[in-house]
């Protein structure tokens, strides 16, 4: 849907600020929102222009975020976070995976609270890693506790920080997604490459579940 990024709409339904807007989900969501008549802005470490999208620079590590970014914003969609599959999970990388999600949410909340910004909603990404990686016949629901492993703890801290937006009387939503697949994405390309060569490798033990969700869902 990226061809819709420059599409105009005669009626603006609302204004949305997205963190992590340059990622797979962020790009697709931006196109969808624009096509539905929303104004979209991005928070990014780089202030590159992205079609009709306003891009504002921020730096969660240094606590840099101009409160003027929130002028006219109705909703925040928080997708920012270091890619969990991009590098080895060294001690430093694990710290980065957590802080890129948690500290960025802390900064958003601080600026919203300190400047009495009136939002209609805060939507935070999360992941099914909340439930752990062990194969199980159990059908998980929102009532299940987080797993006592790295991903479970990461998602728990991530969601706890998102829940703090409830303190500002803002409706808060957390979405636990599986691996998101889209035909042009690098993750999908890695899965398809051996298949195109006539090789069909077994993932893991071959017995574990491999949950996924398509980008359109």
Give the positions of each predicted feature.
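N-terminal Rossmann NAD(P)H-binding glycine-rich loop of SDR-like oxidoreductase domains
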Residues: 14-36
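Catalytic helix-loop patch of NAD(P)-dependent Rossmann-fold dehydrogenases
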Residues: 99, 135-174
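Conserved glycine-rich Rossmann-like NAD(P)H-binding loop of the short-chain dehydrogenase/reductase
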Residues: 38-45
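Conserved Rossmann-fold NAD(P)-dependent oxidoreductase catalytic core, especially the SDR/UDP-sugar
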Residues: 105-149
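NAD(P)H-binding glycine-rich loop region in Rossmannoid oxidoreductase-like domains
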Residues: 48-49, 54-107
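A conserved structural motif in NAD(P)-dependent oxidoreductases
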Residues: 211-217
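Rossmann-fold scaffold of SDR-type NAD(P)-dependent oxidoreductases
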Residues: 19, 73-79, 124-125, 176
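NAD(P)-dependent short-chain dehydrogenase/reductase
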Residues: 165-174, 178-211
